[in-house]
Amino acid sequence: NRYEYYDVRFDEENDEKFTLIQRLRPAVQANEFEVYYQPLINLASNKVQAVEALLRWPQKDGSMIFPDKFIPLAESSGLIIPLGAWVLNQACEFCAKQHENGHTNLTVAVNLSFAQFKDGTLPAVVEQALQNSQLAPQFLELELTETILADENGTTGEQLEAIKSLGVHFAIDDFGTGYSNLNYLQTFSARKLKIDRIFINTLGIGENDGPLVAAIISIADSLGMKAVAEGIESKPV
């Protein structure tokens, strides 16, 4: 014999997920999403060197659904494949247009999901996006989580090598929150190392965060990588 507690919030969460996934497929088919571009600024020159593509799902009432709500559903349903391809095409086209407007050194960064590697078509998708936009591959940067780099059972490594052979660059995203395996930095030639905002937001508060950030930057420098600090939103930081 046993008893369980019932919480109406469980039903509310499940209802919300069910409603979203029912709306997600037609939204993907109709390209109802928008891509915003967050600038990455060189602190030495105070100039924009790159932009990061951020996906949003606008609603008819003017509100916005953020990725943490719909990306997990897209991953579990397989819709991340067409959605991810659409984002890549949008980002490459945006960057190519910026080059035409005189911003010839601008790079665009796009986040990748581990689920995008599952069907083995990602290298072809990346190549097609570059061809469609006529963007030179060195101006596309794909951001990889440590979960992607840790995959040893699938074809992820082969696909990454195929993409790298196109001339596309990589960045390691959210460094310090996953496996943080230094071996990845030695064996995988990424151009950038992105320090997770959890370390940046507490600079000046937590006594260990400053030395940790400095150590990560030093590692990146020694390996010829650029360090990117996420979440800098004030002058003291």
What residue spans do the PLM features occupy?
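Bacterial c-di-GMP phosphodiesterase EAL domain
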Residues: V8-L135, T147-I148, E161-A162, F175-T177, ...
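The catalytic core of metal-dependent phosphodiesterases that act on cyclic dinucleotides
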Residues: A124-L203, I217-V237
